[in-house]
């Protein structure tokens, strides 16, 4: 049934032009019906359904516009296509500046700041993908909780541990959401603050002991799976130097403006501005070149059905999505 609906949504109602895939907006009602079935959407009233349908139509228009404007990426319907842009960004991101829960507990004594600006001294590999080196754990889903900061931080620690010890861990984002004394749970936070909180508390908990449920809960004391020895915050100013950092350090937590990627499906996003301000935390896991177009590879936390099995690519060397900023970070094991 799912495969049939995929075919209906992705094939039978698409018009293929010379440059892009474009939905026929006259088929919006049929598309919405199939969308609701595919993603198991239920609406409590006719009024709610009408609102969601209008959101869906607006997203179809944005998808068409993105596909016509983009040279290297495809945008399409996904499970969030019945949300308006503001609601989606509010519910499924979570990078928030200036939202300290408890400023008195915040010291930054363990976090060193590194400016990434000079050109690399060594010759770098043309491509790097930490997924091919068993340095990235499976994609997760933050659901409707502004906890991207926790997912990005945990993904960074999981990757570094996997690279160092050749052992995959599944660590608890929920423990960070509940127990981080600096960030604000589902209301948002920052990755380097999360690392500071981990250092203050003493360690990271396994997901087996505290599985993710996607809303703020009560902090409980669980045994630590591992500890970290320090943290770094990076001021990103040079994308070539960032390549070197990625090679030497491993996957890195980065902050972006994800607004232009809501409907991303595949390819290299060549139009990703920073017009809305930084709002999302993800994990930088690699880089490459395809058809002379350089790109970054990033791991999202919106589940494996979004994008390229939970990942996305953006064009390199143009500060895509505002990625060159002062909020990248990494743990030190």
UniProtKB/Swiss-Prot annotation:
Disulfide bonds join 145-186, 179-219, 272-321. The gene is VCATH. Residues 21-124 form a propeptide. This is Viral cathepsin. SMART domains: Inhibitor_I29, Pept_C1. Glycans are attached at residue 170. One of its GO terms (biological process) is proteolysis. It comes from Cydia pomonella granulosis virus (isolate Mexico/1963) (CpGV). Belongs to the peptidase C1 family. GO terms for molecular function: cysteine-type peptidase activity.
